[in-house]
Amino acid sequence: MQGRLSSWLVKHGLIHRSLGFDYLGVETLQIKPEDWHSIAVILYVYGYNYLRSQCAYDVAPGGLLASVYHLTRIEYGINQPEEVCIKIFVSRKNPRIPSIFWVWKSADFQEQESYDMLGISYDSHPRLRRILMPENWIGWPLRKDYIAPNFYEIQDAH
């Protein structure tokens, strides 16, 4: 079943995959990394003027990484704004996604955090750097296959 936005994208020949709806009825779409920037601009022009959040996660150990964007279409006089969730999956060997900083400025620190924790590079981001971990930190702490360097678990002696 396609939602309103998915139907509009199909009508205009924009390639995507509908992943269904969440429990609140928000449609989730999968977009290819190479199509993301142009579709992001189209969504902004279409009225999705607010990036509510961006996050990333590791799908499975040794598998894909995902970058997730929650967009909202805010209009004056509308009580229930339209929302959409965009997911972009990338290989962990070369995790590159176009930055949407130039479309929604609020992506700035969110994309930096995703880079810092999972190693996803956001192409053309003006300040992509580590913001939570030290600059010399090795690895990506939120990846499921990450092994913390020099880490020893302390257990209670009960």
From Swiss-Prot:
- Membrane topology field: Peripheral membrane protein
Described by its record, this protein's role is as follows:
NDH shuttles electrons from NAD(P)H:plastoquinone, via FMN and iron-sulfur (Fe-S) centers, to quinones in the photosynthetic chain and possibly in a chloroplast respiratory chain. The immediate electron acceptor for the enzyme in this species is believed to be plastoquinone. Couples the redox reaction to proton translocation, and thus conserves the redox energy in a proton gradient.
Source organism of the structure: Phaseolus vulgaris
Recorded catalytic reaction(s): these are: a plastoquinone + NADH + (n+1) H(+)(in) = a plastoquinol + NAD(+) + n H(+)(out); a plastoquinone + NADPH + (n+1) H(+)(in) = a plastoquinol + NADP(+) + n H(+)(out)
**Gene Ontology CC: one annotated term:** chloroplast thylakoid membrane
List UniProt keywords, sorted A-Z. Chloroplast, Membrane, NAD, NADP, Plastid, Plastoquinone, Quinone, Thylakoid, Translocase, Transport
Q: How does it assemble?
A: NDH is composed of at least 16 different subunits, 5 of which are encoded in the nucleus.
Q: Name one GO biological process term.
A: photosynthesis, light reaction
List the InterPro entries. Answer: NADH_DH_suC, NADH_quin_OxRdtase_su_C/D-like, NADH_UbQ_OxRdtase_30kDa_su
Pfam families attached here?
Complex1_30kDa
Select a single GO molecular function from the record's annotations and give it: quinone binding
Q: Which family does it belong to?
A: Belongs to the complex I 30 kDa subunit family.
Question: What's the protein here called?
Answer: NAD(P)H-quinone oxidoreductase subunit J, chloroplastic
Q: Could you name the domain of life of the organism this protein comes from? A: Eukaryota
Q: Where in the cell is it found?
A: Plastid, Chloroplast thylakoid membrane
Principal place where this protein is found? Answer: plastid
What Enzyme Commission number does this protein have?
A: 7.1.1.-
